[in-house]
């Protein structure tokens, strides 16, 4: 039919920009199974371009030329630091090079980095994509700084990563918190309910943006499409912290991703579920954002010596996800669901999932997140976390007061899942305690009295933590991971929060953010009357 029907042949040849062979390939492979939809046309066209990895290819060409380096870095392809070569390998160290014309420059990309960013934008369905080498922390901060100026209001949930509040300290914007509902059993914050977002928007019509977590660390998703629609109706931008959502762009039957929901900007941790090297990330922008201005904001804080190891890993990982991501994340979801069922069969644990969805505070759930409630066996999540590492050589992502999180991704195997399940069964058998002895604690939403910037730079004094109730905090206090502040600058310290911090320390949570490494003292504002209205 394609060869004989001139009209049909003309249509598909035009659709594939004159590439007759590609058109024939599409007709033969796709139509019998999927139909000739515009979406399938786009998929096969993108698959062709997505096979490229411009930064990686440029590095390979450079290596073939055997260039003699009289530039930095000073290890000179590893020759000046043999121990580094022994640790990382000759090829890795030889590709740790500086910016040069054939390799482009991240601060002002015009060739291979520009091409790689364009391919990333295409793969993630964004208008523009930026390679970020300072982690998603720098991506989130650049996103907020691009939108907010001193005195601007931004609507956001309190359970944001510390990078968001750090950005408010830098730019002087004012947080308007939509405090999500807290699950009293699990002790975690849930998603932003659309009614609460609407209330915050109506009460703060001058706010410039709404920021959303998609998903949270624990897999909870808000109704992102409705939030975007509501914010845009009130001429506000929508920023999405998608640090834990790379896979949402490629997997099937997963929660909606930021760009598909119509969000204006999204920070995506490629190194978490996307397979790139630690510290590599993406910042995505939509059509409503001036990406040239965003580029200027990024360059205020981004290094001028960007790592080509990180950038090439972003390039290669994007290619891998674009070509094989759908199948990869189907397997990831299957492994996570299998693990969830097996862990729940042990008894005592609660591996939560889609059963939490209620259409409101839990609008959707990311099934790739293996979040497990542990207090049912009388152990805090951090205690199970430590036992798995110290006694079973299993390193999981997170342990808090009530939960653990095992991160399942494209590098996991079913035998690894079996080992984790077996270890959890063993932990219950050997180490379980009476749950009645557990302190009943949950995440507490603090009251903001002073803007983060004003509090951070205010005159402060150091006090023993047990004596700080009623004072205004002048620094961050958090468990890491997840890096969500228990207290941030400008928030009221209460007896309940003090109890939470002390209990988390006693259970072994890794505390950080305070000037005092032991977290025995807190910096508080000297002038308690300095209340921001």
Model features per residue range: what roles?
Residues 128-153, 167:
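Conserved beta-loop-alpha segment that forms the PLP phosphate-binding cup at the N-terminus of a helix
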Residues 151-212:
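PLP-dependent aminotransferase-like
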Residues 93-138:
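Conserved N-terminal alpha-helix of the aminotransferase class I/II PLP-enzyme fold
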Residues 338-513:
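Conserved C-terminal alpha-helix-loop-beta "cap" of PLP-dependent enzymes
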